[in-house]
């Protein structure tokens, strides 16, 4: 009657259409990543966090999960923040944790549970203003 708890079939179709990357977009993202990697060598501190997050977002759009995780982890090392990168990283950790649980890989499962705990600590630190 009200549609509570029911998934919108139209939004699923739209999301599937958006996931297809054109060759031009892939090339553009790879160029962006390359330029940002060069740019990051020339700066230090908190500015690096922003650029690493941009690199991570580009890798995420390319569906390169391991590179995405690496870039977002470097971003959080440079500066703790709770932005899009944080949310995507938490989502990827949860996905990796679920895959490890499904494969009965206890070692990987513990690694990703620990990483998720660290992410929760980052959230607390940012909320409290701790650096």
Annotate each language-model stretch with its function.
Residues 45-46, 80, 121:
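Short coil turns that delineate tetratricopeptide repeat
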């Amino acid at each position: 009657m009200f549609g509570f708890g029911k998934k919108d079939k139209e939004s699923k179709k739209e999301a599937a259409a958006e996931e297809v990357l054109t060759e031009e977009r892939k090339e553009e993202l790879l160029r962006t990543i390359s330029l940002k990697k060069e740019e990051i060598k020339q700066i230090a501190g908190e500015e690096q966090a922003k650029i690493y997050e941009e690199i991570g977002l580009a890798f995420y759009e390319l569906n390169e999960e391991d590179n995405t995780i690496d870039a977002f982890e470097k971003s959080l090392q440079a500066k703790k923040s709770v932005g899009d990168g944080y949310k995507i990283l938490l989502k990827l950790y949860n996905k990796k944790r679920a895959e490890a649980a499904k494969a009965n890989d206890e070692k990987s499962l513990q690694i990703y549970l620990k990483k998720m705990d660290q992410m929760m600590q980052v959230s607390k630190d940012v909320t409290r203003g701790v650096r």
